[in-house]
Amino acid sequence: ALMGHMVNAIYQIDEFVNLGANSIETDVSFDDNANPEYTYHGIPCDCGRSCLKWENYNDFLKGLRSATTPGNSKYQSKLILVVFDLKTGSLYDNQASEAGKKLAKNLLKHYWNNGNNGGRAYIVLSIPDLNHYPLIKGFTDTLKQEGHPELLEKVGYDFSGNDAVGDVAKAYKKAGVSGHVWQSDGITNCLLRGPTRVKEAVANRDSGNGYINKVYYWTVDKRATTRDALDAGVDGVMTNYPDVIADVMNEAAYKNKVRLATYEDSPWVTFKK
């Protein structure tokens, strides 16, 4: 997955996909009542980017639905995976479940069109705090209660806090999650981070008895870092510059080894070499 970072305005969906992304990451901020409110990051953010672009969350979902519904005039067939970076740091721990419920209702109505020919992209709910694992159950229970358990086939999970791999595994156990797990590792592009933990995550993915299905690395803007990530065997690279990553993927060392995922590839099944 070639993941466009911080895609928070509707017009940026086309911008990033046209540069080569087949996946986008979008920030979601919450109001005091745990309602998803805006697709907004705020200051500070990655170097070289505007931190202030935003939409109302429900409006963004409608724009995203247009971009991922075959037959729609705005349809982008390459866009197959969306990571919602859930900014739950503004919430109390005891609001996590409520945030999950409200998120499920919003997605069901505005993205999945109540199960009636909605958007087709796979969704990853990315949570920054292991203590907010009840968000997952709030989300999954709500989709079941609303009569759409089949949509959970389209949903995966990520804890994005760079926590110890063992601690993340425990949080998933508490949340009742087995499968559909993406593990992120990374840091803002303003700083450097070594590949130690991403290699650990890849090892867990490939061990056959780990909890991780896919690993992605963020935020990768330089060719050298891209090569390091591809050499480590990641499944996804998140970037501010999709065209840079696409260039590296076309280099002789990689063009026969890696390719962009298509809709037919499962985002939940670990790729066997």
From Swiss-Prot:
<feature type="active site" description="Nucleophile">
    <location>
        <position position="41"/>
    </location>
</feature>
<keyword id="KW-0204">Cytolysis</keyword>
<dbReference type="GO" id="GO:0016042">
    <property type="term" value="P:lipid catabolic process"/>
</dbReference>
<keyword id="KW-0479">Metal-binding</keyword>
<keyword id="KW-0964">Secreted</keyword>
<keyword id="KW-0442">Lipid degradation</keyword>
<keyword id="KW-1061">Dermonecrotic toxin</keyword>
<dbReference type="Pfam" id="PF13653">
    <property type="entry name" value="GDPD_2"/>
</dbReference>
<comment type="similarity">
    <text>Belongs to the arthropod phospholipase D family. Class II subfamily.</text>
</comment>
<comment type="function">
    <text>Dermonecrotic toxins cleave the phosphodiester linkage between the phosphate and headgroup of certain phospholipids (sphingolipid and lysolipid substrates), forming an alcohol (often choline) and a cyclic phosphate. This toxin acts on sphingomyelin (SM). It may also act on ceramide phosphoethanolamine (CPE), lysophosphatidylcholine (LPC) and lysophosphatidylethanolamine (LPE), but not on lysophosphatidylserine (LPS), and lysophosphatidylglycerol (LPG). It acts by transphosphatidylation, releasing exclusively cyclic phosphate products as second products.</text>
</comment>
<feature type="disulfide bond">
    <location>
        <begin position="45"/>
        <end position="51"/>
    </location>
</feature>
<dbReference type="GO" id="GO:0046872">
    <property type="term" value="F:metal ion binding"/>
</dbReference>
<keyword id="KW-1015">Disulfide bond</keyword>
<dbReference type="GO" id="GO:0016829">
    <property type="term" value="F:lyase activity"/>
</dbReference>
<keyword id="KW-0443">Lipid metabolism</keyword>
<keyword id="KW-0456">Lyase</keyword>
<feature type="binding site">
    <location>
        <position position="85"/>
    </location>
    <ligand>
        <name>Mg(2+)</name>
    </ligand>
</feature>
<feature type="active site">
    <location>
        <position position="5"/>
    </location>
</feature>
<dbReference type="GO" id="GO:0090729">
    <property type="term" value="F:toxin activity"/>
</dbReference>
<feature type="disulfide bond">
    <location>
        <begin position="47"/>
        <end position="190"/>
    </location>
</feature>
<dbReference type="GO" id="GO:0031640">
    <property type="term" value="P:killing of cells of another organism"/>
</dbReference>
<keyword id="KW-0460">Magnesium</keyword>
<dbReference type="GO" id="GO:0008081">
    <property type="term" value="F:phosphoric diester hydrolase activity"/>
</dbReference>
<protein>
    <recommendedName>
        <fullName>Dermonecrotic toxin LhSicTox-alphaIA2aii</fullName>
        <ecNumber>4.6.1.-</ecNumber>
    </recommendedName>
</protein>
<feature type="binding site">
    <location>
        <position position="27"/>
    </location>
    <ligand>
        <name>Mg(2+)</name>
    </ligand>
</feature>
<keyword id="KW-0354">Hemolysis</keyword>
<dbReference type="GO" id="GO:0005576">
    <property type="term" value="C:extracellular region"/>
</dbReference>
<feature type="binding site">
    <location>
        <position position="25"/>
    </location>
    <ligand>
        <name>Mg(2+)</name>
    </ligand>
</feature>
<keyword id="KW-0800">Toxin</keyword>
<dbReference type="InterPro" id="IPR017946">
    <property type="entry name" value="PLC-like_Pdiesterase_TIM-brl"/>
</dbReference>
